[in-house]
């Protein structure tokens, strides 16, 4: 699906403009403390001309046939665009934590690392992560590495999403 830059795009958001829109697809997840799984996911990036994007994502567990089994994670926040491809990401999650991420974007790639994590009393232990988003052949590929439940930083989620 072709993508056109919006007329009111803030100049600082140029390096991440390719993310704008709705994306959907399937991914895989694994971690030492859980059984491997497949999931469906939808990501939405919107903007209003100011130097940030609003972000929302939801996921659901799927079976081997791709049929929805149950709802899974949701996250929402703001991707704040700074000069020279620097970005800040503020996220809140339905699982009881909030994060501050810092990173850089260039050449169809966005790399982020957590700077701070805040958890509610009932949230599982989670200490940080790394995210990599890439524009590959017009699709959105991403990988998410996580440190949680006493485990060191390691791969947790990866997916290929297409523009909807």
From Swiss-Prot:
Necessary cofactors: heme b
Catalytic activity, as annotated: peroxynitrite = nitrate
Keywords: Heme, Iron, Isomerase, Metal-binding
One Pfam short name: THAP4_heme-bd
Organism domain of life: Bacteria
Gene Ontology molecular function: any one: peroxynitrite isomerase activity
Motif GXWXGXG boundaries: 21-27
Residues engaged in binding heme b: 130, 156
Cofactor note (record): Binds 1 heme b group per subunit, that coordinates a highly solvent-exposed Fe(III) atom.
Entry's EC annotation: 5.99.-.-
Protein's UniProt keywords contain Heme: yes
InterPro entries: Calycin, Nb(III)_bact/plant, Nitrobindin, THAP4-like_heme-bd
Signal peptide: none
Main enzyme class: isomerase
Listed pathway(s): Nitrogen metabolism
Oligomer and partners: Homodimer.
HAMAP family in alphabetical order: nitrobindin
Stored PANTHER family: PEROXYNITRITE ISOMERASE THAP4 (PTHR15854:SF4), THAP4 PROTEIN (PTHR15854)
Function according to Swiss-Prot or TrEMBL: Heme-binding protein able to scavenge peroxynitrite and to protect free L-tyrosine against peroxynitrite-mediated nitration, by acting as a peroxynitrite isomerase that converts peroxynitrite to nitrate. Therefore, this protein likely plays a role in peroxynitrite sensing and in the detoxification of reactive nitrogen and oxygen species (RNS and ROS, respectively). Is able to bind nitric oxide (NO) in vitro, but may act as a sensor of peroxynitrite levels in vivo.
Domain comment, as recorded: Forms a 10-stranded antiparallel beta-barrel structure able to accommodate a hydrophobic ligand in its interior. In fact, this fold hosts the heme group, which is located in a wide surface cleft.
Entry's family note: Belongs to the nitrobindin family.
Name of the protein described by the UniProt record: Peroxynitrite isomerase
């Amino acid at each position: 699906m072709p993508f056109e830059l919006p007329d009111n795009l803030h100049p600082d958001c140029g390096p991440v403009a390719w993310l704008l829109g709705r994306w959907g697809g399937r991914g895989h997840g694994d971690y030492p403390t859980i059984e491997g799984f497949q999931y469906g996911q939808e990501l939405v990036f919107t903007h209003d001309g100011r130097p940030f994007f609003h972000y929302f994502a939801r996921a659901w567990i799927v079976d081997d046939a791709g049929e929805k089994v149950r709802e899974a994670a949701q996250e929402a926040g703001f991707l704040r665009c700074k000069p020279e491809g620097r970005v800040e990401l503020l996220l809140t999650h339905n699982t009881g934590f909030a994060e501050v991420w810092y990173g850089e974007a260039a050449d169809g790639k966005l790399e982020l690392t957590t700077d701070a994590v805040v958890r509610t009393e009932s949230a599982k232990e989670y200490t940080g992560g790394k995210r990599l988003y890439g524009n590959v052949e017009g699709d959105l590929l991403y990988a998410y590495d996580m440190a949680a439940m006493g485990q060191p930083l390691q791969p947790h989620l990866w997916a290929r999403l297409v523009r909807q």
